[in-house]
Amino acid sequence: MAGKRKNPADSWMPPRVYRGKAAYEFRTKENKAVRLCSLNETQASVWLAYEKAVGEEVRKNTFQSLADMFMTSPDFMDLSPETRKDYTKYSGKVLPVFGKTDPNKIKPEHIRRYMDQRGISSRTQANREKSFLSRVFRWGYERGYVERNPCQGVKQFKEVSRERYVTDEEYNAVYDVAADVVRAAMEIAYLCVARQSDVLSLGEEQISDLGIFIRQGKTGVKQIKAWTPRLRAATSLARALPLKPGIRSLFLIHQPSGSKYTRDGFNSRWREAKLAAQVKYPHLSIDFTFHDLKAKGISDLEGSLEEKQAISGHKNSRQTAIYDRKVKVVPVVGGQKN
């Protein structure tokens, strides 16, 4: 990733690009200066020249170079912070294997072998890392940096849908011992059937007389979650979270400094609550994730699968069915109502 520029006026420039005496210059991995274009050219022209120069470097170099270029591109920066962080994590697994290889020499069978080996320890992570590989290759193929995407046609492992349903007793056990920030986030996630990232990014401007406006980060669906007494109480609890003197926060779920919680920062508080609940309630199994609270919300909703889909914001009922985990009680023979 590119570091901060000494001159803020140069912050728009691509990585490894600098102002020369008469032209913008690109520094190769070998620290050789490659002329891009004159200093009179537009920023867009500099980026085009940069991508061409890096593309030529990729062709004669490695998958590491291709991945570096993707991860400093505008396309990468347009991804959500969580996705960028995940991709950075996945790159740490795949680059030791493919990093020094010419990307055009990586074939589908190489991807398959990686998947099979990685799948021994985690099939889910193997799928995620293959998706990262495919994203890098697709990005490079669209720009002419590689000849093909070797991930195409390589099957992912079948993932078994999670079936864990959080009971009211288990939910209340964690809520009982949790810090207020965790309590507020739990309630909003459950009541609004919302993802953790959408809860942590909630801003004060999303609160209205009608309810809480949420634009789902994954599907892009926009909804206003209508007020109930319980949702109002959760919002009030969040707004009462402590702040340092003189500080105001733009975020509903905020730290004392006023800044939003990162995923890792909040998960640390979440783990603390779960551990405390397990100690206080040893007869319960506190093995659920924060994301399972969304599934609990969908499972506890009344109505048909289609009605639950409309409330959840999923694009199809198949997605909603994955989250609908409560075991249905059905009549036996002779017990049906007329």
Regions found by a protein language model. Name each.
Residues 14, 161, 165, 169-170, ...:
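Conserved tyrosine-mediated DNA breakage-rejoining catalytic core shared by Y-recombinases
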Residues 35, 72-145, 260-265, 287-288:
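N-terminal core-binding DNA-recognition domain of tyrosine site-specific recombinases/integrases
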Residues 124, 184-187, 191, 198, ...:
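C-terminal catalytic core of tyrosine-transesterase DNA break-rejoin enzymes
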Residues 127, 146, 152-196, 200, ...:
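Basic, Lys/Arg- and aromatic-enriched nucleic-acid-binding interface segment
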Residues 206-209, 304-324:
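Short, polar N-cap/turn motifs at the start of nucleic acid-interacting alpha helices
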